[in-house]
Every structure is written in structure tokens, then in C-alpha cells.
From Swiss-Prot:
Belongs to the universal ribosomal protein uS9 family. Its main location: plastid. InterPro entries: Ribosomal_Su5_D2-typ_SF, Ribosomal_uS9, Ribosomal_uS9_bac/plastid, Ribosomal_uS9_CS, Ribsml_uS5_D2-typ_fold_subgr. It comes from Oltmannsiellopsis viridis. SUPFAM superfamilies: Ribosomal protein S5 domain 2-like. It comes from the Eukaryota. It is found in: Plastid, Chloroplast. GO terms for cellular component: chloroplast; small ribosomal subunit. One of its GO terms (molecular function) is RNA binding. This is Small ribosomal subunit protein uS9c. The gene is rps9. Pfam families: Ribosomal_S9.
Length: 125
């Protein structure tokens, strides 16, 4: 079991011995991600390091954020779950950046501004 987060997306990933199925919120992964090749490859990245694509079924519950953020949250959750299964995977995953949580989040809106940084038009007179 591994938890991954990215922006507002939170993914709970469970790895079960199987044949490589990806199930996200009860749907096949390809359907849930609208056959987005980038997102699917991103999720499979940690498995490809150790040639484990066909060894585990991945069952995911994910909510919040958009598809890209959800895919990145799932990727982090998969990497953390692989570390729980075998601790010797940790240094390799860490050196390839799969265990790093992307801390970039939306900057808050400030009072007196239109958005986080966008100011109303300045008039000298």
C-alpha cells in the first residue's frame, strides 16, 4: 500500500500479485486515463526499472486534481508501494526521482490583486 499526492490529487495504491492489470477507481486504467500515453507511461515508470510490469496488479483509489496530477500521484504511490514490498528498491527509485514528492502547489490569491500575482491596471493620473 502506498499513498501519493500531487497538487490536489491524492492516490491510494495497492499492489497485488497478478498479471499487470491497472484498475483506477473501479475502471481499467486505459479507460480512466482516456488512453493518455504520457500518463500511462508515467505510472508504469517505477515498474519498468525492475521489470515488474507483469508481476503485480495495481488497484488505485484516486480523487482530486486533474488527470495529469492524478497520474503523478499514482506514480508516487506505486513507487512507495514497491519500497514497502522490497526495501532494496528504495535507493534505485530515489536516484531516479520516483520517491520525490512534487511540492509545487497553487499560490494563493492576495487581497488587492486580481489573481495570485496579477495586479489591476495602474493609472498614473
Amino acid at each position: 500500500m502506498g499513498t501519493g499526492r500531487r497538487k490536489r490529487a491524492v492516490a491510494q495504491v495497492k499492489l497485488v500479485a497478478g498479471e499487470g492489470k491497472l484498475i483506477i477507481n473501479g475502471k481499467p486504467g486505459f479507460d480512466y486515463l482516456h488512453n493518455n500515453a504520457t500518463a500511462i507511461l508515467s505510472i508504469q515508470g517505477p515498474f519498468q526499472l525492475f521489470k515488474l510490469q507483469k508481476k503485480f496488479d495495481t488497484i488505485v483509489k484516486v480523487h482530486g486534481g486533474g488527470l495529469s496530477a492524478q497520474a503523478d500521484a499514482i506514480k508516487l504511490g506505486v513507487a512507495r508501494a514497491l519500497c514497502e514490498i522490497n526495501t532494496s528498491h528504495r535507493p534505485v527509485l530515489k536516484s531516479n526521482g520516483y520517491l520525490t514528492r512534487d511540492a509545487r502547489i497553487v499560490e494563493r490569491k492576495k487581497a488587492g490583486l486580481k489573481k495570485a500575482r496579477k495586479a489591476p491596471q495602474f493609472s498614473k493620473r
